[in-house]
């Protein structure tokens, strides 16, 4: 269209339709419906000389010849806006609220378009009982005030990271190319925070899938926005299977044939949220503390599913910023994250354990890209889960209540001898010690090594040992400020860790494995 000669004539009688000239790109006239479940419409206007708006029709002139469109074929009266830039995404009516009349602006309760706000990729609905002000969404029995615009701000930051950096969705190949993710604020004072996705229909009856989440004002304000980012993270996890099919995206459990629950959703959602609020990752007084108390557990153990949100930093340092999203998209039913990791990267079980051990050694001093500076005040805070066998000979054994499991680890704070001293750990893996739980003892395996840190921040990593009986050693460097001994449970063969909220944990015979060990130190000892 020649925009210099373009002119717009609006009939005075037609005040119900808005036709703003929003951009120089006037090759298309776009229609955005007030019923946000109705797909946007478009009218070609390329090469037009002028557009005339009358009380009953739209005339588009090309070389003086008019082409007319009656309004009834384009928009319902008082039901749409017309514009020269694409209105972007619309909404899918979720099956969750299939019986809700979103066009009933007079409703006193429930959800409708009149009680919603939108951004480029998200829509926020609040229950009409909260009132009309999107900036003051407050339950009479609760003190928290949610602001729908603040929710959108956090959500859009999530989009930039989860889609733009982490790769959970691929623009141009995603349902989010058409549909906005929907977030709802229910009318209740109690805690509620959940998200995933659902199927639904547009106004034309076309089915699709969309991300959907819920949080009360309490949850919307929690953790400085981290809870919002966590729940939005779940919608992106769901969208993996929406885009690629349910054999991708870990919509299954790990009992061998895909049934049960999946704690990896929570682990990754917390890590995703920390990418939005990185300043909270080592300071919020919550998940890091839980992590310190639980990292001896199986990597996929449900008891620390919210706190297992630190290994992802190592994996993305090792394999790229988008690796977590890549794992989600390339996962295949019924494999768990360890199996997916190994398959995607072509690693053997030994190679996987070696990579994990390197990560845990780095975690001793948080020598990991992206967290190295923010976590430096946390160095030395790992707990020593050992019991003394013989203090005189510096002999210790893994504590039975905190013994390492598959891919669980101990980071033990050690005393620092003088520079040049050779410290040793004479290690014995135990497969028949009394009091421990053995599962597949024939698959027993360990990794163990020393780590030293110098005053200038340089790290020195000792050679990793793997023998059931062996010796790890390290020569203490100059200006050594910290010394650690790291041990990891490294089974020689992987097996899944099932979890089902409706089944007692004791029902799973393959769970609860322990890899105890005894170690006798020379020239150093643990500092409890």
Residue ranges and their predicted role:
Residues 24-94:
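Compositionally biased alpha-helical segments
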Residues 64-67, 72, 76-210, 218-232, ...:
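Zn2+-dependent metallopeptidase catalytic core
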Residues 18-20:
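N-terminal signal peptide c-region/cleavage motif recognized by signal peptidases
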Residues 163-181, 243-252, 259-262, 282-288, ...:
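Surface-exposed patches in mature extracellular/periplasmic domains of secreted proteins
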Residues 2-10:
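Bacterial N-terminal signal peptides that target proteins for export
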Residues 334-528:
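Beta/coil-rich, acidic/histidine-enriched accessory regions frequently appended to metallopeptidases
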Residues 289-367:
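Active-site-proximal alpha-helical
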Residues 209-282, 288:
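Zinc-dependent metallopeptidase catalytic helix centered on the HExxH motif
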């Amino acid at each position: 269209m020649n925009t210099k000669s373009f002119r717009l004539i609006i009939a005075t009688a037609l005040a119900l339709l808005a036709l703003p000239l929003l951009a120089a790109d006037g090759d298309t006239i776009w229609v955005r419906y007030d019923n946000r479940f109705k797909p946007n419409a478009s009218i070609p206007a390329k090469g037009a000389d002028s557009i005339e708006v009358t009380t009953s029709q739209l005339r588009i002139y090309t070389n003086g010849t008019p082409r007319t469109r009656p309004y009834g074929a384009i928009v319902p009266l008082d039901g749409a806006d017309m514009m020269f830039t694409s209105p972007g995404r619309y909404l899918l009516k979720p099956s969750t609220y299939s019986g809700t009349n979103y066009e009933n602006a007079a409703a006193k309760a429930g959800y409708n378009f009149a009680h919603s706000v939108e951004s480029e990729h998200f829509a926020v609905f609040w229950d009409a009982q909260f009132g009309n002000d999107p900036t003051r969404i407050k339950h009479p029995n609760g003190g928290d005030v949610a602001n729908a615009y603040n929710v959108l701000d956090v959500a859009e930051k999530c989009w930039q990271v989860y889609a733009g950096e982490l790769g959970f969705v691929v623009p141009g190949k995603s349902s989010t190319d058409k549909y906005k993710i929907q977030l709802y604020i229910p009318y209740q004072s109690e805690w509620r925070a959940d998200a995933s996705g659902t199927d639904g229909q547009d106004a034309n009856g076309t089915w699709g899938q969309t991300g959907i989440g819920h949080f009360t004002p309490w949850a919307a304000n929690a953790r400085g926005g981290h809870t919002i980012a966590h729940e939005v993270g779940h919608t992106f996890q769901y969208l993996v299977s929406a885009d690629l099919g349910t054999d991708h995206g870990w919509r299954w459990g790990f009992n061998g044939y895909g049934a049960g629950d999946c704690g990896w959703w929570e682990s990754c959602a917390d890590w995703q949220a920390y990418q939005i609020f990185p300043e909270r990752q080592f300071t919020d007084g919550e998940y890091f503390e839980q992590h310190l108390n639980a990292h001896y557990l199986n990597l996929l153990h449900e008891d620390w599913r919210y706190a297992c949100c630190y290994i992802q930093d190592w994996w993305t340092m090792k394999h790229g910023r988008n690796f977590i999203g890549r794992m989600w998209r390339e996962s295949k039913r019924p494999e768990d994250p360890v199996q997916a990791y190994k398959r995607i990267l072509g690693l053997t079980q030994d190679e996987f354990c070696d990579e994990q051990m390197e990560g845990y050694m780095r975690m001793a001093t948080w020598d990991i890209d992206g967290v190295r500076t923010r976590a430096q005040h946390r160095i030395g805070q790992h707990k020593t889960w050992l019991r003394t066998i013989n203090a005189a000979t510096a002999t210790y054994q893994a504590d039975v209540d905190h013994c390492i499991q598959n891919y669980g680890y101990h980071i033990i704070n050690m005393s620092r001898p003088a520079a040049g001293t050779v410290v040793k750990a004479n290690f014995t893996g135990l497969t028949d010690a009394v009091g421990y739980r053995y599962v597949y003892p024939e698959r027993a395996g360990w990794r163990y090594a020393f780590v030293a840190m110098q005053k200038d921040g340089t790290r020195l990593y000792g050679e990793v040992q793997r023998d059931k009986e062996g010796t790890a050693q390290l020569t203490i460097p100059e200006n050594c400020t910290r010394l650690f001994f790291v041990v990891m449970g490294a089974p020689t063969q992987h097996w899944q860790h099932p979890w089902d909220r409706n089944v007692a944990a004791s029902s799973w015979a393959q769970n609860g494995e322990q890899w105890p060990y005894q170690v006798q130190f020379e020239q150093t000892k643990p500092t409890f």
